[in-house]
Amino acid sequence: MKKAIFSTEISLLRSTMQRLLRRRAHTNISKILRKTHQADVALIMRSLSQYDQKKIFSLCPTSLHKARLLEELDDSLIEKVLEHESEKNISKIFRYLDTNDQATIIGMFPDSKQQEILTKIEVDDKDDVEEIMSYPDDSAGSVMTKETFTLNQNTTVKESIKKLQSFPENDKIFYLYVLDNKEKLVGVVSLRTLVTSKNSKKLKEIMIKDIQAATTSTDQEEVAKKVAQYNYLALPVVNRQNKFLGIVTIDDVVDIIREEASEDFLQMAGVGKDREILLKSPIENAQSRAPWILASLIGGICAAGIISYFNSLLEQIIVLAAFIPVIIGVGGNVGTQSSTIVVRGLATGRVDAANTFPLIFKELLVGSILGVAYGLVVGFAAEYITGIDMSNLGLVIGLSIFCSMTIATAVGASVPIVLKKLGFDPAISTGPFVTTAIDIIGVALYFVIASTILIN
């Protein structure tokens, strides 16, 4: 069994591979690929040119090795290495892939090539692949595997163990799923329970009847939550009639969690939700990030318009301009903190309809406490920093910071919840849209308070 290696060895392997590629020592490369774990090869390929990526893939010693490497590669790299592969070669590789992996890879190709590949894969696999491809993206149906072990509820323990031993896909067996005569899921048996039960007992006597399952349309994020909540190694997938269709395994769940977390982090940073952004070209990268920057630009123009509206006030009291960055900064930061906390709570299931209002009130209280503390500090400091003898200047600055931070926490906490109820991804609430809105509100409040107290 090949073992995974550490980062220092990865660096050494990468430099060795690059040197051998330059020397065109293809035989040596094949020998290294045979001995190296595919996950490590996939990691190395990220830093290679597209030509070298294809060369490494072509030098894999067997179709089985290529299949295992495809399982580890990023989606964008899979497209590149298979781009010029013939449908015949792809079908050979597919013999060693699960049907859900086959469906995912076929979905990357144009429709014409999809049909050509489907005609060349095995008949049994073809039906399963076409079924998986028919389900919506990011649903349980689209990520389930059909290679699983099921038995009728009237099967004895002795017969079950015998059939289990002869099952070809035994690396996918986490649980034994029990079906009735209509292929409906009626129970589940752990392998431990199976081997410790009497041979004469039937599965319906030892199975667990209270089953957690997903339907084909269940969002993959909900599947991941169920697996994490109940510590399952796999989750069964059924249709609306409770007919058993397949399972989502723990390795797929790990991938789902990683993908969803990456999407959330990217959206929270305001760079879209493309998980492969690091592997995109500069032009593609700029295109995905441009809309988010545009939101900040529009917000900045709005803030500039508000400042221009109060131009006469600034002409009279120019020192007010010095504290605009402070007002914007504290409001934006505390608002982002609140929205991040709520987004994380929604993702983990700790925030729901039952505790929505208490949570918003709690964040509002946090914003008020921080607003009082920082408002007092900056308000008193303003009198000394400016060196201007102006009554109520500190009051204006302190009150503006208090209002900005209080409102920012309320907005930051409530917007993700509202977006969730409207069916949008709440992660976008921590991006430029909300922070820009908080900046505009903060600037407007600052000048309204200043004009009210200092002029009137």
Residue ranges and their predicted role:
Residues I440-I441:
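Active-site His/Glu-centered metal-binding helix of metallohydrolases
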Residues A261-A410, S414-I428, P432-T436, L445-N456:
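Alpha-helical transmembrane segments and their membrane-interface boundaries
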Residues M1-G272:
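Hydrophobic packing positions in regular secondary-structure scaffolds
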